[in-house]
Every structure is written in structure tokens, then in C-alpha cells.
């Protein structure tokens, strides 16, 4: 049950007041000031989101009660930690990111379980497994610049995060900071499962994530996400193709990159180098003819049968002209129930 004081503050925070009342709100404990925030604490009557300042829309500027509590803990704002806990924030989340003994004691006095070892990893995995917008945002806020991560097995954590998402988070495990890895992890999970509120939140709070959004869309073979991302990201078509070729059966991403002007012969060789043979045959369908180089590469990989097949002069190409603005609907329609033409050609050749 809320205390009388917390109830009174809840009523005040749920209403709108003129700037003349701001000094009273500061005295009343409904003001939040730090490096990025400076304004009255308000609560949306419709979605229970916390808003700080004079913003009319909680979708762009609001935060859940748990996220507000987590940020208050990181700010060492004792009065707001107590208030948000009374209003329904989960103090256990606050305890997981308390970075001083005094703040840890405060969280425990408010009912938090003392965090221990595996609890941090269990929470991280749980919040990403629920596939819920708010849980991904909670996870990001808890572990963003969390000192406890200085004491975890870094390589083990990187491997776990990489295995949990279908999208490559980095080029090499040892060439990315943990903070950036976690940011990419939360973002990749949001894009992978189309959690739009989480994507919107991360776009507003994590700098320079638009190029990674495009990488995710290419890897996930989603022409509509690719099309949207290309409106704000200027990436070289050959770089896009390189990403598309890393996952087999990524025909829509390959076709989109090809239509933008990516080199289809390079794509054929990249696909073979990654061992993604369906992609390689699709590139041949689109007009790739680097058969000599591909045959040599197949020989180096000890794929003798493939090397022999690539030496046959039987392949046909379906040339699709490049265009500046590919249509994702057209791409999806072209590839609906698509069968690899030149794989069928090979079967016909050997079954004569």
C-alpha cells in the first residue's frame, strides 16, 4: 500500500501545471536534475510512463517505472529511488546496477535481494529471452556502464551473447569493447524479433546504431527493413553484399544489394568462401560468371566435385538490371517460391 506522501506525489505528478509551480515541485521532491535531465517528474495517466520535462508524448521521451528507478539508482538520487520503488518500480533491478555500497544498502533496505555472482548473468539472459520491448530496455539500462561487468569472464560473456543472437555482433571477438557489444546485443535482439518500441528507444539512446540496424536487416534477409534502413544509412553496395553473403539462403538481401550495383562476381566468390553454396548458385542465376576463380577456390577447399561442376559450360543467367531504389515488394514477389535455376540445370545435365 502506498504511503500518504507517495500517494500525494502520484496525484501531483499525474497532472499538468504551469511553470510558476515548478519551485513548489522542486521542494515537493518531484524534480529530476542531472547531466541530461532537468525538469518536473510527471507520470502518464494512460501508460504509467515517467516523463521528465515538458514533453507532450511519452512514446518519444517517457520511460517505464523500472527504467526510471534504474536511472535514479545510477544517479544516486535517494529520494527518487524511494519514490519510484513505492510507485511500483522493481528494486531488485536497482540493486543490480547500484555502484556504491551506500546505494546497495539503500536498495536492500527497500526490499531488494542482495545480488550474487550468477544473478547478473541470469538476469541478462532472462530479460532478453522474454522477447518483450520493456524487458530489452530494462536489460540495456541495467548493464549500460555497470561496474560489475569489470569482474565477469569477458570472453565467455562475448561467446554467450554471440550464440544467443542470429546476427554477428562483431567481426572478431577481441576487437570490440564490452559496452559496445552489449549495445549491439540488445539492438540485434530488438531488430531480430521486430520489437519496434525497443528499436525506437535504442535509436534515441545509443549513438550511431543506424549502420548496425542495416547490418541486422541484411543478415536477417528482410528487404523491407533494408529499404527503411537505407533511407538513413549510406553504405556501399559491395559492403552490403558482403554482409548478405555471410548467411546462406539470403536471396532477398543479395538481390537488393545487387540491384543497388554490388559486384555479383565478388558475391559469388564470397558466398563460396563462406561455404554458403545456395547463395553462390543464386549469384550465378543473377549473372555471375567467375567460374575460373570459383573453381580454383573450390579446389583449395578440397571440393573436387564442385570444382569439376564449375568447369562445365552449361550455366544460364537471368540478368536483372540494377536500379537506384529497389522495391522490396517486387523483390519479395520475384523470390516467392524461388528455385535455383542452375542447380536444376546441373541435375538435368547429369540425368540425361
Swiss-Prot record:
Keywords: Early protein
Induction line: Expressed in the early phase of the viral replicative cycle.
One BP term from GO: taxis
Family indicated by similarity: Belongs to the asfivirus MGF 360 family.
Purpose of the protein: Plays a role in virus cell tropism, and may be required for efficient virus replication in macrophages.
Name of the protein in question: Protein MGF 360-16R
Biological source species: African swine fever virus (isolate Pig/Kenya/KEN-50/1950) (ASFV)
Amino acid at each position: 500500500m502506498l504511503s500518504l506522501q507517495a500517494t500525494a506525489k502520484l496525484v501531483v505528478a499525474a497532472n499538468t501545471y504551469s511553470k510558476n509551480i515548478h519551485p513548489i515541485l522542486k521542494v515537493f521532491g518531484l524534480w529530476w536534475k542531472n547531466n541530461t535531465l532537468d525538469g518536473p517528474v510527471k507520470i502518464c495517466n494512460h501508460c504509467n510512463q515517467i516523463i521528465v520535462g515538458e514533453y507532450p508524448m511519452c512514446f518519444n521521451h517517457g520511460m517505464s517505472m523500472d527504467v526510471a528507478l534504474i536511472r535514479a539508482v545510477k544517479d544516486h538520487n535517494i529520494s527518487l529511488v524511494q519514490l519510484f520503488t513505492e510507485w511500483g518500480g522493481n528494486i531488485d533491478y536497482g540493486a543490480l546496477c547500484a555502484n556504491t555500497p551506500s546505494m546497495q544498502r539503500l536498495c536492500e533496505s527497500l526490499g531488494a535481494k542482495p545480488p550474487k555472482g550468477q544473478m547478473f548473468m541470469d538476469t541478462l539472459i532472462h530479460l532478453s529471452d522474454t522477447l518483450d520491448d520493456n524487458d530489452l530496455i530494462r536489460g540495456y539500462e541495467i548493464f549500460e556502464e555497470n561496474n560489475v561487468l569489470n569482474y565477469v569472464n569477458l570472453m565467455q560473456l562475448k561467446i554467450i551473447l554471440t550464440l544467443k543472437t542470429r546476427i554477428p555482433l562483431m567481426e572478431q571477438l577481441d576487437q570490440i569493447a564490452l559496452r559496445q557489444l552489449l549495445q549491439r546485443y540488445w539492438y540485434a535482439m530488438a531488430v531480430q524479433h521486430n520489437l519496434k518500441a525497443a528499436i525506437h528507444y535504442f535509436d534515441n539512446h545509443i549513438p550511431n546504431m543506424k549502420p548496425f540496424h542495416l547490418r541486422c536487416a541484411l543478415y536477417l534477409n528482410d528487404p523491407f527493413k533494408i529499404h527503411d534502413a537505407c533511407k538513413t544509412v549510406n553504405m556501399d553496395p559491395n559492403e552490403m553484399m558482403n554482409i548478405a553473403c555471410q548467411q546462406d539462403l539470403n536471396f532477398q538481401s543479395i538481390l537488393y544489394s545487387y540491384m543497388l550495383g554490388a559486384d555479383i562476381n565478388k558475391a559469388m566468390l564470397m558466398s563460396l568462401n563462406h561455404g554458403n553454396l545456395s547463395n553462390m548458385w543464386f549469384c550465378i542465376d543473377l549473372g555471375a560468371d567467375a567460374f575460373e576463380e570459383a573453381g580454383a577456390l573450390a579446389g583449395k577447399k578440397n571440393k573436387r566435385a564442385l570444382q569439376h561442376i564449375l568447369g562445365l559450360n552449361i550455366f544460364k543467367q537471368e540478368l536483372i538490371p540494377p536500379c537506384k531504389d529497389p522495391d522490396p515488394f517486387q523483390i519479395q514477389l520475384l523470390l516467392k517460391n524461388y528455385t535455383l535455376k542452375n542447380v536444376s540445370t546441373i541435375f538435368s545435365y547429369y540425368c540425361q
